[in-house]
């Protein structure tokens, strides 16, 4: 199955601006996607799947758009 991944903030600088297409086994979870991408779960502040708030255990579907927003700090 294929999903698209969109990055923001520091992840966008690291991974690129355009949404990336990733192939996964059917029934894969968001956590498995992050593992495939080499991203630690604790890096993610906001996680959205196809426009809705999501969890790391959520199963993905064909053509889902996964938006990854890292924790943002400042002072």
Regions found by a protein language model. Name each.
Residues 1-74:
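Ubiquitin-like/PB1-type beta-grasp interaction modules and other compact soluble beta-rich domains
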